A protein has these predicted regions:
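Compositionally biased terminal segments of proteins
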Residues: 1-149
């Protein structure tokens, strides 16, 4: 697996997700890099379980991270196909509620928990990442598939 360097803001946010017991998976470019194809990415993609209990936890994590209370509603994290963006590339966080071709709970049961520095991070498994990339089907997803083991 590739060595991953995280921006301090990403570390802080991941620590908050863990401290609030948020059910999440790291997907996208960071997951591709972890699974063996390091490449440039402009953001960190975090897929969350879209449930009542998890929406309360993720909203609390966002507030603790500094998002104004009035801009973060728990219902925001219950919407299908929602993308919540924070920051500017290359230090942008994208929290998503849906991922193409895969089910969150199934993927969560297959997750790989990896320690980077002092942070335990939930990564989508290689098999589930490949399913997701295949279903998404964008040019960069196909390129990722060609380079993943």
């Amino acid at each position: 697996m590739a060595r991953i360097e995280l921006h301090p803001d990403f570390k802080d946010f991941l620590r908050l997700l863990n401290s609030h017991n948020v059910k999440y998976l790291l997907v996208g470019g960071y997951a591709v890099g972890y699974h063996g194809y390091p490449r440039a990415t402009g953001d960190m993609d975090i897929w969350i379980e879209s449930s009542e209990s998890n929406s309360k936890k993720i909203a609390a994590a966002f507030r603790d991270f500094g998002m104004p209370h009035e801009t973060i509603s728990e219902s925001l994290f219950l919407e299908k196909d929602k993308v919540i963006r924070m920051g500017i590339p290359p230090v942008r966080l994208e929290v998503i509620t849906t991922a193409s071709g895969v089910d969150f709970n199934e993927c969560y049961s297959h997750r790989e928990v990896i320690k980077i520095g002092d942070i335990l991070i939930n990564f989508i498994s290689l098999q589930d990442l490949k399913k997701n990339k295949h279903a998404a089907g964008r040019h960069k997803d196909i390129a990722d598939l060609e380079h993943l083991p």
